[in-house]
Amino acid sequence: MSATLKLTEALIACHSVTPADGGCQDLIAKRLQAIGFHAESVVSGPENFQVTNLWAIKKGKAGDQGKVLMFAGHTDVVPTGPLEKWTSDPFTPTIRDGMLYGRGAADMKTSLASFVVATEEFVTTHPDHQGSIAFLITSDEEGPANDGTVIMCERLQKHGQRLDYCVIGEPTSVNTLGDMIKNGRRGSLSGKLRVKGIQAHIAYPHLGQNPIHLSAPAISALVETQWDKGNEYFQPTSFQISNVHAGTGANNVIPGKLVVDFNFRFSTESKPEQLRERLEKILKDAGLEFEIDWVLGGSPFITGDGDLAGALRKAIKAETKIDTELSTTGGTSDGRFIAKICKEVVEFGPLNATSHKIDECVIVDDVVPLKNIYRKTLEQLIA
């Protein structure tokens, strides 16, 4: 069994449903300290939601003049769902038919193990490496993400820590290992719209104001609006309604209020304040009496096809013979926080088809190649 597969299994065996770390970061820290890293654990969050974060760094021979490459990821996993639906225990790593099963196998404990072993191999073969290597690991990525990477980035910025490159181990591959790198993510802006009406007996509509009827034209306009056209990196901004609620449950009462939950996934062609203003104008022009609670989940970020993406492309090509694709599709990630303090941020990892699913798994034969890709990226950028 390879060192990478063995460490992956050890990490999967740790029960680490958000915000628990389950001992994963301790395993990682000990491995890194053994090869010369300075490691620091930072616990944050309220007593009922304690988050564990790990920062580790090994300075290169060039000191502060050298480049800094950071591996970033998360040790927390989503809940298992019904245990009886799993073919094997989700926290007992199990190899079956060429697949490694377990919660977090794809998202993202295989990547974490690959980071560590790639770094061990790199440091052994390049003891005088010029650039520095860093790790930023959290146990609060799958949850609220209020006490994880975001506070660690603020901490690093406060201490003046420069970052040049960051590889996040999210599972980005689609059909085969290496076919996709995420070099950016769309922003996320959510809102809860409350439209005021007047409750009344449904037989006397003249005595009430039905907020569903009043809102229908405006909602239709929101759905049909082209918010932007996107660009070479991003699809056009999308507006989606996720929940609609009105009424008392009785079929003879005009509701007094309509509540609509919605979300924008927006490109760099739009700014949050522009989207808010345009949406509110449509509602005001419709004569609605309303209020909205807004939540900005993250701003979009993009890393062009520069040094980091280029090095990762070459590493993938050398290991898999695949010409990879750069993409910004998918949901938000902790890259939205890291991009504020790091020049180049990309995400790359194993196949994502089973992430968060029952019987989550990775292809066993992908584990060592993934590690090799990370190591070859280090060799190109900081050796």
Swiss-Prot record:
Binding site for Zn(2+) 1: 74, 107, 170
Cofactor(s) this protein requires: Zn(2+); Co(2+)
Molecular functions per Gene Ontology: acetylornithine deacetylase activity; cobalt ion binding; succinyl-diaminopimelate desuccinylase activity; zinc ion binding
InterPro entries given in the database record: ArgE/DapE_CS, Bact_exopeptidase_dim_dom, DapE_proteobac, Peptidase_M20, Peptidase_M20_dimer, Peptidase_M20A
Gene Ontology BP term (one): L-arginine biosynthetic process
PROSITE patterns: ARGE_DAPE_CPG2_1
Cofactor note: Binds 2 Zn(2+) or Co(2+) ions per subunit.
Keywords annotated in UniProt: Amino-acid biosynthesis, Cobalt, Diaminopimelate biosynthesis, Hydrolase, Lysine biosynthesis, Metal-binding, Zinc
Uppermost EC category: hydrolase
Pathway annotation from the record: Amino-acid biosynthesis; L-lysine biosynthesis via DAP pathway; LL-2,6-diaminopimelate from (S)-tetrahydrodipicolinate (succinylase route): step 3/3
EC number(s) stated in the UniProt entry for this protein: 3.5.1.18
Catalysis performed (reactions): N-succinyl-(2S,6S)-2,6-diaminopimelate + H2O = (2S,6S)-2,6-diaminopimelate + succinate
Binding of Zn(2+) 2, residues: 107, 142, 356
Presence of the UniProt keyword rRNA processing in the record: no
Active site: 76, 141 (proton acceptor)
Sequence similarity: Belongs to the peptidase M20A family. DapE subfamily.
Protein purpose: Catalyzes the hydrolysis of N-succinyl-L,L-diaminopimelic acid (SDAP), forming succinate and LL-2,6-diaminopimelate (DAP), an intermediate involved in the bacterial biosynthesis of lysine and meso-diaminopimelic acid, an essential component of bacterial cell walls.
Subunit structure: Homodimer.
Listed name of the protein: Succinyl-diaminopimelate desuccinylase
Organism of derivation: Polynucleobacter necessarius subsp. necessarius (strain STIR1)
Top-level taxonomy: Bacteria, Pseudomonadati, Pseudomonadota, Betaproteobacteria, Burkholderiales
